UniProtKB/Swiss-Prot annotation:
Family per record: Belongs to the DnaJ family.
Zinc finger (CR-type): 133-211
GO molecular function list: ATP binding; heat shock protein binding; unfolded protein binding; zinc ion binding
Subcellular localization, as worded in the UniProt entry: Cytoplasm
The protein's name: Chaperone protein DnaJ
Organism of provenance: Bordetella bronchiseptica (strain ATCC BAA-588 / NCTC 13252 / RB50) (Alcaligenes bronchisepticus)
């Protein structure tokens, strides 16, 4: 199935600002996060789709490539991409028109140089860790140059031979009608070399799979879906090409109490109906400890209390967000006969006072009467 337009996925215009893109992605990520939709395959696919769209549009270079060439401009499997953003359509057209106008392919005089592939690492952290920031150690599986042959792929005491198919250029030219198209050599795969006596440690590949340990600094205020770039810690390049980068993608675990919305936090505040009716002082949790709020008499379910600066200070924020406590009035259950009798007596006393004790109920009753009149 064809991919949807990334701007359409995020629901933004093509001239959307970075902040608009971030807000749109955050909204979709919260809505379709697997933790909130544990049994929904559709939600999981929408979460992945939004994540993929933001990874492209949130990166200046990738967005420019996407705006110009569409999905092909950011597809790492597209011809000429070489693991980075430097190839793609520019290389493809260079191959075709270079033969006509005399322009050579980039690096066309010898083996093709490739940038190493980027790596991604998903790191799950708690909301508390995201708020305060911390240093951590991660182990990343990646390809590294073989210690025995130092990346050559040849057995010790020997060296790779010049590829007989491409003559060491790493590329061959194919005639297609009026055009001569340059393609990666099928024999040496662009290296320009053939391994006749392979290294026993890596079987001639020149690289081995291993885990490397890295120190990563998680900044305070980081949000779900954000990425930390570790330059040069991706896979090694080919033929002397630069290494790729490592991107640590942050996933924040669902919290038992708080839900995050940008720099603000939200929580449900359950109070007994007696406190709702009579008022009182309550302690509420915050990420920094406990805070006290005053519950006024006659508080109803749905009322929201705002505690300023009790949210999270964002990565680029000057001030912390707020904490919003949403009141839920709890109805008592499993009452004894004596308690039921007391409540019935209490209800009778309220009825004697008319509607003044239940303003919302009176308003609702009036609306129902008006609806049926």
């Amino acid at each position: 199935m064809a991919k949807r337009d990334y701007y359409e996925v995020l629901g933004v215009a093509k001239n959307a600002s970075d902040e608009d893109l971030k807000k749109a992605y955050r909204k979709l990520a919260m809505k379709y996060h697997p933790d909130r939709n544990p049994d929904s395959k559709e939600a999981e696919e929408k979460f992945k789709e939004a994540k993929e769209a933001y990874e492209v549009l949130g990166d200046e270079q990738k967005r420019a490539a996407y705006d110009r060439y569409g999905h092909a401009g950011v597809d790492p499997n597209a011809a000429g991409m070489g693991g980075g953003m430097g190839g793609g359509f520019a290389d493809a057209f260079g191959d075709i028109f270079g033969e006509i106008f005399g322009a050579g392919r980039r690096g066309g005089g010898g083996p093709q140089v490739y940038r190493g592939a980027d790596l991604k690492y998903a790191l799950e952290i708690t909301l508390e860790q995201a708020a305060s920031g911390f240093d951590t150690e991660i182990r990343v599986p990646s390809w590294e140059n073989c210690d025995t042959c130092h990346g050559s792929g040849a057995k010790a005491g020997t060296s790779p031979k010049t590829c007989r198919t491409c003559g060491g250029s790493g590329a061959v030219r194919m005639q297609q009608g009026f055009f001569s198209v340059q393609q990666t050599c099928p024999t040496c795969h662009g290296t320009g070399k053939e391994i006749t006596d392979p290294c026993p440690s890596c079987d001639g590949v020149g690289r081995t799979r291993r885990n490397k340990t890295l120190q990563v600094k998680i900044p305070a205020g980081i949000d779900d879906g954000m990425r930390i770039r570790s330059s040069g810690n991706g896979e090694p390049g080919i033929n002397g090409g630069p290494p790729g980068d490592l991107y640590v993608e942050i996933h924040i675990k669902q919290h038992k109490i708080f839900q995050r919305d940008g720099d603000d936090l939200h929580c449900e505040l359950t109070i007994p109906f007696t406190t709702a009716a009579l008022g009182g002082e309550l302690q509420v949790p915050t990420l920094g400890g406990k805070a006290e709020i005053s519950i006024p008499e006659g508080t109803q379910s749905g009322k929201t209390f705002r505690l300023r600066a009790k949210g999270i200070r964002g990565v680029r924020g000057s001030y912390p967000g707020d904490l919003y406590c949403h009141v839920v009035v709890e109805t008592p259950v499993r009452l004894s006969d004596e308690q039921k009798a007391i409540l019935r007596q209490f209800e009778a006393s309220l009825n004697d006072g008319g509607d003044r004790h239940s303003p919302q109920s009176k308003s609702w009753t009036d609306r129902v009467k008006e609806f049926f009149s």
